[in-house]
Amino acid sequence: MSGIVFSTWRDEFIDNRGKPDLEWGKSEFKLPETYYGDTNSKAFIGWDGVAIFDEDIDAVELASQYAAQYQEYSEACGRCAPGRWGGRILYDLLDKIARGEGTHDDVAHLKEISKTMMTTSKCEIGKTVPKPILDLMEHYQEQFNTCIDAQMPSKHYNGDTSYIAKVTAPCTDMCPAHVDIPAYIEGVRDMVFTDSLAATRQTMPLAHTCGRVCPHPCEDACRRTNLDSPISIMELKRLGADYETDHELPWLHPAEPKPLRNDGKKVAIIGAGPAGLTAAYYLGLEGIKVDIFEELPVNGGEVAVGVPEYRMPIGKYQKDIDLVLELEAVSITNNHRVDAARLKELHAEYDAVMLGFGARLSKKVRAANENVNMGGYWGAIDMLDKVNLWHKYQIGSPASNELNGKTVVCVGGGFTSMDVVRCSIREGAKKVIMLYRRDEKTIIRNTTYEEYHEAVEEGVEFIFHSAIEEIFDDGENITKLKVNRFELVPDPNGGRAQLVKIEGGDFEIECDYLIPAVSQALDTQIIPEDWNIEMTSWNSILTNGKDFMTSKEGLFAAGDCEYGPMTIVNAVGQARRAASVISRYIYDGKCTLLDDEIMEDHLNRLRVYDKKEKITGWMPGLPRAESEKLEVNERKTNNKEVNLGFTGEEAISEAERCMRCYYISMVAV
C-alpha cells in the first residue's frame, strides 16, 4: 500500500509496522512517496532522518548505499579526518554487514564512529550522515542481526532497486537556479576566485548580474541566521566574475563547449533577456544550434533597458552576454519582432522554440479619470527604457529633459518602482514620492533592505497604506492626485490583515508625472489564436512548471512569459531547466527530467532549511560584513555603481563565516 511505513524525519516518529491500515499515522512533511510519474519510492534517507514507504525495505542495504554516497563525497573533499576517514570506515563496515560478513563488534564500532563524526566533522555533511544510519540500526535492528548472526547477505531487493542521491544545502535549495553556493564561497575563502566562478556557472551563467541585482532568497535559508545573521551570499558571488573580467582571463565555462553539431537540429529562442540568454548558454555548451530573436536594438532584455546603471553597470552585464554569444552554436538577431505569423514560421522551421520574452506592458493603477495618453502619465517600463537607453547606449535623449525640476509620483512597491523613483532623483526631479498600499516591512520583503534604505537616503518620500482614487488634469496634463489612506485590520480568522479605507483620510498631491509601477503584463499577441495555448489566471503561458513545455507540442516557455513578472534568478533557474529538457526533446520527442532535476523538485517541496533548528558547535557573534556604498550626495546626481563590493580582506572574512551546510539525500526506487 502507499503511505509512510516508518519515519524519523525531523524528529517526527512514525511507526506503522504491524498496524491496521486505518490506524496508520501520517507525516506533516512532504516526503517523496512518489518518485516520478508512476514510479513509487521505497525509501527516502537524508540528513534529518529516514522515511520508509515499502514494508519490505532492505534497511541494511539502504544504510550501506547511503554511506557509499557519502564516502564518495568525502574522498573528494578531504578537508577533515573525521569526515574523510570516518566516511571510509562507515561504508566499509556497513558493506561488510550487507555482504553477510559482519560481526556485532562492527555494529558497536559503527555507533562509535558515527558519534565521533557527528561531533568532530568540520562541515554539516559529515555531522549529519550518521543520523539516519543510526536510526536504521536502532529501529531495523532485526535485519542487521539477521545478516550478522546467519552470516547471510541482505536481500538487495533481488537486484531491482535503484538508489538516487543528491548533495544539496539549504541555500542551494532556496536558490531558484540551485547554485552550489557553499562551493563558490569556499573558492572566495581559499582565494581561488576561478574555482568560485566555476561553481557559479554550473547553473548560473549571469554571475556578474546575479552578484549585483539578485534579491538573494538564499540568504533567507542560510543556517547562519539561526546563529547570528546570514552570510552575504549575493555579494560574494560577484568576486569570481569580477576577477575574471579585471584580469582579462579567458572565458571560464563549467565544461569545455562542444563544437557545433552537424545533425541539423536547432532551437529558436524568443527574447535575449536572462531567460533567453541562459537557455542559449546551456544548449550552446552542448553544441546545439541556437538562434535568438530579440525585438530591442540591444541585447540583455529588461536587465539592459530596465535595471539602472547604478545598480547593474552595463559593462559588467555585457560580459555575461558576451559569455553566451562567444559560443559557436549561438547566434542572435536584433530588431526582430516576432509576431504570431513569424512564430508559426519558426515553430515549423525549428525542432523546438522557447519563449523567453519579458513582461513589458505597464499595468494601470485603476483610478478614476486614468488616461494613459494624458500628458504626465508615463508607464514605468517606457520611462526606464528611456533612462537606460540613453545612459547605457546613447540612444534617444535624456529623461532629465522631462523630469528635471518636476514632482514625480510613482505607485508600486517592487523592484521596478524602486528603479523608477531612484532614477527620477538622478534625472533631477524636484520631489519624488512613492505610494504603496502596504507597509515598510512588506516593501523591504518585496525588494531588499538595502534598496529601500538607499532610496530613503537619496530623498525619496514613501507614503504607506495609500492608493490613488482619482487623477485630475487640466485637459492636457496631469495636475494632481486624490489619494486614499488605509489601515490594516486583522483578519478574525487568522488570515492576512485586510486593508480598510479610512473615511475622511484622503488627501491631494500636486504632481507633474504619474508613473505606475504596480506590475507588468505580457504582450500575448505573439501567440497565434488558433493554437489555443493554455494560459494562467495571470495571463501568462501555462506549463507544468517542471519541464516548461506549453500545451503546444515543441513550444516551451520560461521566465516572465511563463510565470509573470519575476526576478532574474527565477528566470535563470527556469531557463536552465527548460534548456536541459529541450536538449533531449529535440532528439527523442519526449519531455523528461534528469534524476538530479527530479531530486531538486523533491527537496524544494520538502524544504531543506529548518528555521527552528538550534545550531551547535559554532561560535555565534561574528558580524556580517557590509560592503562599501557610494556616499549619498555623490551618487544621487549620477549613475555610478552604488555598491562598491567587498575588499579582498572583507570577502575572505565573510566567506569564513560559512558553515558549509552540505547535506546528502537519497531515494530508493
Predicted regions and their residues:
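Redox cofactor-anchoring modules in respiratory/redox and cofactor-processing assemblies
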Residues: 1-161
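Iron-sulfur (Fe-S) cluster-binding segments and ferredoxin-like electron-carrier domains
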Residues: 81-104, 108-109, 114-118, 125-144, ...
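Glycine/serine-rich phosphate-binding loop and adjoining beta1-alpha1 elements at the start
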Residues: 177-181, 186-259, 325, 345-392, ...
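Beta1-alpha1 glycine-rich phosphate/pyrophosphate-binding loop at the start
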Residues: 179, 183, 188, 230-234, ...
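Glycine-rich dinucleotide-binding loop and its adjacent helix/turn
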Residues: 241-260, 322-327, 332-334, 364-427, ...
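Feature captures the FAD/FMN-dependent oxidoreductase FAD-binding
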Residues: 261, 266-270, 318-367, 470-482, ...
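FAD-site-proximal beta/loop scaffold in flavoenzymes
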Residues: 375-405, 492-565
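A conserved FAD-binding loop/helix module that cradles the flavin
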Residues: 561-592
